[in-house]
Amino acid sequence: MESPFMDAEARVISLDPSARLHLAEPLAGGVSSHTRRLVFEAADGVHAVVERRPKAMPGKPPPVERATREAALLTRLPDLGIPAPRLRRFEPPDTLVLDFLEGEGDPPAGAPASVIGPMARLLVALHRLGPEHGLPPLPTFTDPLADLRTWRPDLFPADAVPGPACPPLAGPPRLLHGDFWMGNLLWRDGGLAGLLDWEDACLGDPMAELAAARCDLHSRFSADAAEALAWAYAALAPVDRARLSWWDFYMPTAQLTHMDGWGLPPDDLARVRTAMTERRDQSLAALGMG
């Protein structure tokens, strides 16, 4: 199969004319993008970078749009204390070259208890950021009902008076990573060392991202782990339980709508489908709509 990237030797020389390539290897686990790691030696030492090119994915904007957004963010986020990789180069239309972050994808010993606190702290740190922090223009994501009416028209009949309503967002939209799950986290020495894959970032309701992270903990560990994350978050920042209830319905519904296009192994797909069906049904009951 043809490589989605330029010649590895040419790439590292484009970054530093003194570079000598040591290693070029694809990185496993990327569902929404092609990725490879390059290690090279230059006059100032050894460097490691990652190349990324987004793939076309159901339910996501086009690859060029996602790559452009991620490139703009990654010139800013490391300076704001967020453990995101720094952009080395953006090569239009859709190729990013990023600093390689050291860390492990597997959670530390003692999970899920060992991951709840670090995840909550990172979420709260993200959600304190907004346009006033010099972020690039981003799409907004504040209303769960628009998509839900499309996905579940049976729950939103046109003649219903009044129809189901979600309380308005109380504050300004904040920075959301847009795909906050364990697969995008790196761990080192028991702590969070990196948050990867910023192509879906937006300004929106923090409760949407909290609900998404809760889905992942539910499917990976248990419903109790998902609830523990909400309590850990609430110890650091306000939790709007009324809006969280709607996002707790939205997120599993979105996953059930799109997961067949994710390319997951059959066993993983079955596990996530079972957990998200359970979570969707529980959230519907909590909203009084089940």
Please provide the spans of the model-predicted regions:
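An alpha-helical support segment within catalytic cores of ATP-dependent transferases
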Residues: P4-A19, R128-G178, M276-G290
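Hydrophobic packing residues in well-ordered alpha-helices of helical domains and bundles
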Residues: A67, I116-M119, A226, F249, ...
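Active-site activation/catalytic loop segments of kinase-like enzymes and analogous catalytic loops
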Residues: M207-P238, M251-D267
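Active-site-adjacent helix/loop segment of glycosyltransferases
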Residues: A242-W246
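Active-site acidic catalytic loop and adjacent metal/ATP-binding pocket
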Residues: S33-F40, G45, V50-E51, L87, ...
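ATP-binding pocket architecture of kinase catalytic cores
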Residues: E25-P139
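Hydrophobic/aromatic-rich alpha-helical bundle segments in the mid-to-C-terminal region
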Residues: G134, D260-E278
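Glycine-rich, phosphate-binding/catalytic loops in enzymes
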Residues: S114-V115, G194, L210-A213, R273-T274
